[in-house]
Amino acid sequence: DVCPNKSRACFTFCLDNAGRGRFDHVKLARLVKTKRYRLDPAKFTREVSQELARKVKWWSSNRPAWQLVLRADGTSDIGIGRRICHDHPSVQFMDYTKHLQVIRRDCKIPYGSNYHLTFSWSGENEQECREALDLGYNVAAPFLPNTKSGAWHPPEFMGYPVISGENDDLRFL
């Protein structure tokens, strides 16, 4: 399991089944990558870093004005981005986690100036979400549209303003 803090509530809204993630070929590719990671985490991480280095080279040649952004843990919580962000200072890393200890550690000793963390709501971790918010981190939480107003999200959640992630989730900006 690459997302050990998942809950029944968050499974309903998981990115694993959203958009392209719901297609069999995408699920199979993720499964193959997970198996490769489990067999040799160090080798897999090295290969991801090498692939990213090739992408950085291509982007710097073909799209020099664009910022390359990597969300390594979109559907997992294994922390590859945390391990390779220092090797790729020109890349902006963004990750999601349900591990409060990862947030606490980043708060004390940041993983990198090019690494941004967002804490994920699971439906069962309100206390942890409050702590992450109080520490200055964003919390990602899914909302169903209000059947009366049609609004996709409330104006506030846990006393903090809600910013819609419908257009983008570039919280580091």
Per-segment meaning from a language model:
Residues D1-L173:
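Class I S-adenosyl-L-methionine
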